[in-house]
Amino acid sequence: MGRGALILALAAATTAPMAGKPPAALISHDAFPGWPSDFEDHPLKPLPLTERESGYVRDFPGRVGRFSDGKREVVVRWVIEPTRRLHPSADCYQGLGYRIVPADSERDSAGRRWSAFHAIKGEQALHVRELIAGADGRTWSDISSWYWPAALGRAVGPWWAFTVAENQDTRAGKSE
């Protein structure tokens, strides 16, 4: 095989995964369906975004909301296109000075698998879990497993990304 043919073959092999469906169709910010009023059978109360979160959402392709159900903080991100701006929550906590300790993934009552970690800073110990859900009902337990299917048009958006944080002391009081 000549050098030109080899380069062409390599280029074709490199771009073949992108030859499928185009990336997610453009979804307008106007298509936003509104924030959920409850989460896991608990009513949600809107909280203001922190200054840091407000800066983050300026260029975010979608919307970000912060809520409390009285015991847990729930950050909800509505994402209209594949983006590297949707990154693992552990990165945010680490950037805020928390020590991150991986935890076993968890299944919720609907059978969806969530990634989980512990975020520890001084005396505060949080249990944090994360899930991304697509418009077609598919879910991903971490951002990296979502990104490439979304970027290659193999995942249907818009997507909802949920991050749930609760004090480990509160969580330890739950009956198993």
Which residue ranges define each predicted feature?
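Internal/C-terminal transmembrane anchor helices
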Residues: 1-21
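General structural signal for secondary-structure boundaries
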Residues: 1, 48-50, 170-171
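Aromatic-capped interface at the extracytoplasmic side
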Residues: 19-30
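Short, solvent-exposed recognition patches
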Residues: 33-152
